[in-house]
């Protein structure tokens, strides 16, 4: 980090530190160690942990070794959130607990499954100040393992990239707002002006809900893909991935059933068109008018190639490696099923489950 960049991040009157990093954590023993190690490594001359900035981990009633692991890091403050009050989600309650103890002019809310590259905390503040925004959110590089995750996750993130494109989100005149709670940096005065997480206490997607308030209040919002700054492994099992997206998809996409139908149509075309071309060629071999019928099969094949190209062009926007993108057709039936289940939970059952807690009648 250059000296000029360090000097650009200054303390402000009223808060003794530049930044407080708040890490809400519930049963994150598999990931919180790597997260905190990457955060502690940010400390360097001119940007020293405990002098310019701090880390606050909020243990959200974990039943594993999350608290013990966090407490083992020197310079890290560990708090206990306790059970949330009625009407509060666990994550919003944990973040609010951390904010009450925070001493920074800027607040970074980041998940316990993230890994941060050296030097990028102060650079993020510099970026937010340069763009004069009250909220800066990064979409991390996603780390996935196993066939199911590799086939499904690019589909989800490509849809998110199309719907919540940074060009729309970063345009103050456009109504679209988005943020990613895995890395959400806010200027404290702007955050307090909107009421903090108390304003989104019952929102299942509190990050997007908070971004919408910031944009509506014209406090400045910037959102972008930032693989150079942060990465995350969101899910360590297929079950956890299924439960997580089941909670979120119906909230992220306005018409999940319509989207499910379109993805099923993708599957039908990708699989069906080659068989249709083969069938036409078989008819051409044995039927009358074989010479002309042969070209009909070629037309069908060209339509399939065009469909395949458009499909991969769309999924390529997910920022996943092409090895994962190529597997995306295998994930289409799973994506459609997940969209349906998420719609059913939110619309019919009106209840979602996450990290052992049930939420009913919560805001979108």
Give a label for each model feature.
Residues 30-34, 63-72, 119:
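Acidic helix N-cap motif at the loop->helix transition within catalytic regions
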Residues 263-349:
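Membrane-embedded multi-pass helical conduit in multi-pass membrane proteins
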Residues 37-52:
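Short, acidic, metal-binding catalytic loop of nucleotide-sugar glycosyltransferases
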Residues 65, 112-127:
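Acidic donor-binding/catalytic loop of UDP-sugar-dependent glycosyltransferases
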Residues 80-100, 123-193, 198, 249, ...:
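Long helical/loop segments within the catalytic core of UDP-sugar-dependent glycosyltransferases
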Residues 38, 59-68, 83:
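A conserved acidic beta->alpha catalytic loop
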Residues 128, 135-161, 189-192, 197-259, ...:
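Catalytic donor/gating beta->alpha subdomain of glycosyltransferases that bind UDP-sugars
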Residues 17-20, 54:
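Cell-envelope/extracellular polymer assembly enzymes that use nucleotide-activated donors
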């Amino acid at each position: 980090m250059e000296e000029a960049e360090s000097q650009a991040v200054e303390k402000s009157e009223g808060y003794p530190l530049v930044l407080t990093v708040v890490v809400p954590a519930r049963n994150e023993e598999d990931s919180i160690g790597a997260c905190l190690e990457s955060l502690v490594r940010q400390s360097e001359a001119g940007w020293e942990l405990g002098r310019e900035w701090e880390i606050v981990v909020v243990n959200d009633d974990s039943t594993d070794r999350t608290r013990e692991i966090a407490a083992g890091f020197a310079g890290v403050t560990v708090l206990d959130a306790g059970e949330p009050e009625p009407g509060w989600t666990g994550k919003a309650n944990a973040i609010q607990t951390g904010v009450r103890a925070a001493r920074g002019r800027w607040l970074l809310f980041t998940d316990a499954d993230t890994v941060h590259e050296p030097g990028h905390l102060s650079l993020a503040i510099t970026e937010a100040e340069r763009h004069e925004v009250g909220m800066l959110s990064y979409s991390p590089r996603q780390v996935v393992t196993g066939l199911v995750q590799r086939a499904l996750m690019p589909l989800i993130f490509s849809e998110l990239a199309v719907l919540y494109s940074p060009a729309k989100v970063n345009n103050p005149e456009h109504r679209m707002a988005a943020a990613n709670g895995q890395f959400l940096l806010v200027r404290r005065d702007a955050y307090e002006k909107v009421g903090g997480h108390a304003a989104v206490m019952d929102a299942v997607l509190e990050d997007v809900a908070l971004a919408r308030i910031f944009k509506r209040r014209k406090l400045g919002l910037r959102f972008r893909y930032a693989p150079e700054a942060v990465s995350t492994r969101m899910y360590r099992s297929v079950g956890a991935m299924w439960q997580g997206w089941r909670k979120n998809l119906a909230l992220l996409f306005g018409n999940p059933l319509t989207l499910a139908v379109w993805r099923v149509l993708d599957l039908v075309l990708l699989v069906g068109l080659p068989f249709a071309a083969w069938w036409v060629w078989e008819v051409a071999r044995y039927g009358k008018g074989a010479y002309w019928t042969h070209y009909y099969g070629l037309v069908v094949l060209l339509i399939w190639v065009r469909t395949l190209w458009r499909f991969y062009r769309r999924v390529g926007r997910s920022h996943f490696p092409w090895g994962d993108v190529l597997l995306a057709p295998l994930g289409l039936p799973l994506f459609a099923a997940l969209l349906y289940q998420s719609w059913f939970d939110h619309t019919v059952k009106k209840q979602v489950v996450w990290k052992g807690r049930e939420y009913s009648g919560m805001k979108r």
